[in-house]
């Protein structure tokens, strides 16, 4: 029997008198086939260390611990720590850290792996309400995670992996794809969770690029430009950029020069630009002193 078997999950919750907290976005997966598929997608073996976020009662952790060198699981809910100590008692390669992943010094914890030089993968069922902040926090942490295989709301997975000229494409797609390749591996129906969420989930596989997707003069400025270009999706690039940089004649002249340098027309929409075009635009705007 597995932790994720529905009857076992119910028994664990009842034995510990656990009640779900909506503020933590808790939905526990009760399908062992999907858990195995997650581990297979992440290609976990004994030469890999794993960071897990939000282990819950340990359903995914159990599968990870069986396959990985070590698992470090970050759980914000104190009430789950004794439950995890119970459900994972047979594993000596799991460390549960009762902390908010957004507030810890990750490098310090990673140094505590028995073999910190092994590749580190992030495998997690992320809370819906905080998926994007967690992902960007990890991606921008400077820690060279080799791969992320994470479950999230299907809509968010679609946005992250979206390509130009699609409805889902936006600044989040660019922010992630600058650092990583992103592809939806498979869909997880809402019916396999306790309690069932209102929407379906997706497993997103992201692999770190050896170098960022494009070369830019100023990364921070590049991301500011991409965000500004999608503030009003139905507006043209020109309208979004003048809203962000200003509408004085001097600014307009600089914007016109930058668009010409980047080989872009003013009435194009942000969703039509790929990372290469945004890199050209960002560098051109920078060269105009904007």
Swiss-Prot record:
Q: Specify the species.
A: Streptococcus gordonii (strain Challis / ATCC 35105 / BCRC 15272 / CH1 / DL1 / V288)
> If you read the UniProt record, what top EC class would you report for this enzyme, in one word?
transferase
The cellular component terms of Gene Ontology attached to this UniProt record, alphabetical and capped at eight, are:
cytosol
> Mind telling me what this protein is named?
Ribosomal RNA small subunit methyltransferase A
Family that this chain belongs to:
Belongs to the class I-like SAM-binding methyltransferase superfamily. rRNA adenine N(6)-methyltransferase family. RsmA subfamily.
GO terms (molecular function) for this protein are: 16S rRNA (adenine(1518)-N(6)/adenine(1519)-N(6))-dimethyltransferase activity; RNA binding
**Reaction catalysed?**
adenosine(1518)/adenosine(1519) in 16S rRNA + 4 S-adenosyl-L-methionine = N(6)-dimethyladenosine(1518)/N(6)-dimethyladenosine(1519) in 16S rRNA + 4 S-adenosyl-L-homocysteine + 4 H(+)
Q: Which InterPro entries match?
A: KsgA/Erm (IPR001737), rRNA_Ade_diMease-like_C (IPR023165), rRNA_Ade_Mease_Trfase_CS (IPR020596), rRNA_Ade_methylase_Trfase_N (IPR020598), rRNA_adenine_dimethylase (IPR011530), SAM-dependent_MTases_sf (IPR029063)
Detail which positions bind S-adenosyl-L-methionine. Answer: 27, 29, 54, 75, 100, 125
Keywords, sorted A to Z: Cytoplasm, Methyltransferase, RNA-binding, rRNA processing, S-adenosyl-L-methionine, Transferase
Task: Give the gene symbol.
Answer: rsmA
């Amino acid at each position: 029997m597995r932790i994720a078997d529905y009857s076992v999950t119910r028994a664990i919750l009842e034995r510990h008198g656990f009640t779900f907290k909506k503020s933590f976005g808790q939905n526990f997966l009760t399908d062992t086939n999907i858990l195995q598929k997650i581990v297979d997608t992440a290609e976990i073996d004994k030469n890999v260390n794993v960071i897990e976020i939000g282990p819950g009662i340990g359903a995914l952790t159990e599968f990870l611990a069986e396959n990985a060198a070590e698992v470090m699981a970050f759980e914000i809910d104190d009430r789950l720590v004794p439950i995890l100590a119970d459900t994972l008692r047979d594993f000596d390669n799991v460390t549960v850290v009762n902390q908010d992943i957004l507030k810890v010094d990750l490098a310090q914890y990673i140094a505590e792996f028995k073999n910190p030089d092994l590749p580190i993968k992030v495998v997690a069922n992320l809370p819906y309400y905080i998926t994007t902040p967690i992902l960007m926090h990890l991606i921008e942490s400077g820690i060279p995670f080799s791969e992320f295989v994470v479950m999230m709301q299907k809509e968010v997975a679609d946005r992250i992996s979206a390509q130009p000229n699609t409805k889902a494409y936006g600044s989040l797609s660019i922010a992630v794809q600058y650092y990583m390749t992103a592809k939806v591996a498979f869909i997880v129906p809402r019916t396999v969770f306790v309690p069932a969420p209102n929407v379906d989930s997706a497993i997103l596989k992201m692999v770190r690029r050896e170098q960022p997707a494009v070369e830019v003069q100023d990364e921070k400025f590049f991301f500011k430009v991409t965000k500004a270009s999608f503030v009003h999706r139905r507006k043209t690039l020109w309208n979004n950029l003048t809203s962000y940089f200003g509408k004085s004649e001097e600014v307009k002249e600089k914007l016109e020069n930058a668009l010409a340098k980047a080989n872009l027309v003013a009435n194009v929409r942000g969703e039509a630009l790929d990372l290469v075009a945004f890199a050209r635009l960002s560098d051109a705007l920078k060269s105009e002193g904007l």
